[in-house]
Amino acid sequence: MDNGSATGISESKVNQYKGEAYFMLGFAYCELTAYYGDCVLNKGMTLDEAYVATRSPKNEVLAYAFECLDKAAEYLPNSYKGQQRPTKGAALGFKARFALFHEDWQTAVDAAQKCMDLGVYKLHDNYREMFQATSSPEFMFYFKGDLTLKKGYGFMENVRDFVIRKIGGHCNQSPSLELFCSYTCTDGLPIDKSPLYNPKDPFANRDPRLAMTIQPFKTKYSADYAEYEQSKKDGTFPEKYPDYITLGYEFNPSPYANTVYEVSTGKMVVNTDSKASNQHSAYNGLILRKFVKDDWKDFNNYNLKADNCYPYLRYAEVLMTYVEAKNEMGQCTQDDLDKTINLIRERAYRETGIAYPRVEVQSQEALRKIIRMDRRSEFAFEGIRYRDLLRWRIAEKSHNKSMYYLNRAWSNSANWNGLTGSESNIELSQDFITLLKNWDEGNYPIGGIPTIDENGLPNLAPMETAGYITTFYKMS
């Protein structure tokens, strides 16, 4: 950055490289402060200085990180053609994200507002199609897989873990039942409050993002179950019920569903995604739909990879950052809600024929719950939830409770009665069992950074004295 003008490169290119350098520098320090708090701040050390450097206060490091992102926003353009490079909006968007993480509400609002004022980004018209698209006006910073290079990003480094066993997948990375239950009903109420929720037909009357994120399936209690079954006999199933097909097959995790519809032949074939035939089918009966594309069927040809765009920052997050920060400052207005969370909800309900549940101004605590639930629904499987749990100080609760899985079909359970989602009833139905997942509150990957001793090994004694968990630093 100091010597760019002496290289003979055009000023516009020098400015681009400066912007990208500031972007990476600011982003890296934001990540460090999010996970470690205080950290070494290097603004140009000599080697001797680096040997004795100590951690700088988190607020000092964060201020420098935001300064770098501001400089990046000054140098970077609004957009590029045909290239995946950081832009002005990405710099501002990440500044908003990390300001929110550190509860710097005003900075988060200001950075998000600048993103919104750029006029460059907008919500993708269709929520489900966005995650199958090769580009989107909503993507502010993303990675694109490449099947020629056999490279995927995010969990698409190994899609076999997410696809059905019928085509050779493992299907062992399931959406949690807690995520499933967190989606509201179409009246905007959670399932334990809404009269619309039917535990025996759990996808009915739910936020449309549920069936766009988790693969839906029919139960014999569904209102149109007779028509559903008839369509498989008369060959109209793919046309009438496309949402219940994944990768060429009907999905039905019920232990009583011995066969499923195969699109290519129009015939019923053995169901290998049910506990009736495979003990390792989806452990809780749920599989991912978000991101899944038909060409995932060929995952073995591409070293298990997929070429989806994996959004690391979406415009929807900027909108949700804005409204959350405004609410935390006690300044959230109806206009704020309408241009953020309500805009996102309207998109989710578009083309469904159902009016979206408009969020209206109410108490700060009530809005806080709504905003947090919507973040979970909107950004599932996009790498955001973990940091949200940390900054909301609820990870010790969410990670220290039961998880629910289906028993094998031959476990002497009498019925598979659907999903009730009741926190007070540990056995969600007779076929659900619980596995306790423990979480030590002190075991967050935040805080301790070991010094290095004369042998080049981490010196853990000061960390242990300070109360940090150091297990993950020790060699086995």
Where on the chain are the PLM-derived regions?
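An aromatic- and glycine-enriched ligand-binding surface/loop that stacks and positions planar moieties
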Residues: 88-263, 399-416, 423-424, 429, ...
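TPR-repeat structural position
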Residues: 62, 105, 332-334
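Conserved, well-structured interaction surfaces
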Residues: 1-36, 50-52, 56-60, 69-83, ...
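C-terminal substrate/ligand-recognition segments
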Residues: 208, 212-344
